[in-house]
Amino acid sequence: MKNRDVIVKAGSRVLKSTPRKLNLVAGLVRNKKVSFATVQLRFCEKKAAGLIRKVLNSAIANAQNYGLDIDNLYIKEILIGKSLTLRRVCPKAMGRANRVSKRYSNITVKLGEII
């Protein structure tokens, strides 16, 4: 199985999920065939799986625009990155307050073709 360079890619920015949670789900489908990955993500019950599946479907649509055969595609890379972080205040007893971080993420999916 020889692998060529990256054929197509798709991405999504500022998604309301932490990079840590997305990375757990991305590990399930990294370096897998596209057909296997879509089934895995469809039956995974985590919210992050739905977010990654949308980006993967976008990358598959980009591959179809180039006339590539979907059966020969695999996920070469899934990059999960940090995006912006909103800081919020959570009031505590005796006039104190804690800071709460609302984290956002970026996803990039790169597909390669199996020759």
Curated annotation (Swiss-Prot):
Keyword annotations for this protein, in alphabetical order, are: Ribonucleoprotein, Ribosomal protein, RNA-binding, rRNA-binding
- Keyword flag Nucleotide-binding: no
Matching SUPFAM superfamilies, A to Z?
Ribosomal protein L22 (SSF54843)
Signal peptide range equals none
**A GO molecular-function descriptor:** rRNA binding
GO CC term (a single one): cytosolic large ribosomal subunit
Checking InterPro entries in the record gives: Ribosomal_uL22, Ribosomal_uL22_bac/chlpt-type, Ribosomal_uL22_bac/org-type, Ribosomal_uL22_sf
Write down what this protein is called.
Large ribosomal subunit protein uL22
Q: Which organism is it from?
A: Wolbachia sp. subsp. Drosophila simulans (strain wRi)
Q: Which gene encodes it?
A: rplV
